[in-house]
């Protein structure tokens, strides 16, 4: 009967319980563990939100360290799934970029876990409306569109 009551408690709890196989073992470095698909999707969401904020000129409201860490996770996955080894020039660039982003994350992360609360400053009413999209800026740009939006984000 304890089994059933335990299962009911687990199902009725508001936060889902993490499986034990995803938790890192104490004393081991988590950087050697490849990111799961769920972690990669979360990283992609963080980077996409950062790109949207940069497009709205709100990049000062983001945790840049968290975005850098998410970008490093995505680069690591691209390196592994693309089978770029450390001997190829592309693999070397990916390693350097990942190391830079991890260093940036460790030195600039606020540790708050989320973006700071928005300030109470009112937007100026005299801001002009954005110009209509050009023909070459239509949707379907893919990853290149996000790269263009986030171009000056980490500066």
From Swiss-Prot:
GO cellular component: chloroplast; chloroplast envelope; chloroplast stroma; cytosol; extracellular region; plasma membrane
Modified positions (N-acetylmethionine) in chain numbering: 1
Subunit structure: Interacts with DEK3.
InterPro entries xrefs: Nodulin-rel_1/2 (IPR040294)
Function field: May be a negative regulator of the ABA signaling/synthesis pathway.
TM helices/strands, residue ranges: none
GO MF entry, a single one: mRNA binding
Ranges where the record places region Disordered: 1-37, 85-155
Biased composition (Low complexity): 120-130
Residue spans of biased composition, Basic and acidic residues class: 95-106
BP GO annotations: abscisic acid-activated signaling pathway; regulation of abscisic acid biosynthetic process; response to heat; response to salt stress
Protein name per its UniProtKB record: Nodulin-related protein 2
Stored PANTHER family: EXPRESSED PROTEIN, NODULIN-RELATED PROTEIN 2
């Amino acid at each position: 009967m304890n089994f059933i009551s335990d299962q009911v408690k687990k199902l009725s709890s508001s936060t889902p319980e993490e499986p034990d196989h995803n938790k890192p073992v104490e004393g081991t470095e988590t950087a050697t563990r490849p990111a799961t698909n769920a972690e990669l999707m979360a990283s992609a969401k963080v980077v996409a939100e950062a790109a949207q904020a940069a497009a709205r000129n709100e990049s000062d409201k983001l945790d840049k360290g968290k975005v850098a860490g998410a970008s490093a996770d995505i680069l690591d996955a691209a390196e592994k799934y693309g089978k770029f080894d450390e001997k190829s020039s592309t693999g070397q660039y990916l390693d350097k970029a990942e190391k830079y982003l991890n260093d940036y994350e460790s030195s600039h992360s606020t540790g708050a876990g989320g973006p700071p609360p928005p300030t109470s400053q009112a937007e100026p009413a005299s801001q002009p409306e954005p110009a209509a999209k050009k023909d070459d800026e239509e949707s379907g740009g893919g990853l290149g569109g996000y790269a263009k939006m986030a171009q000056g984000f980490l500066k």
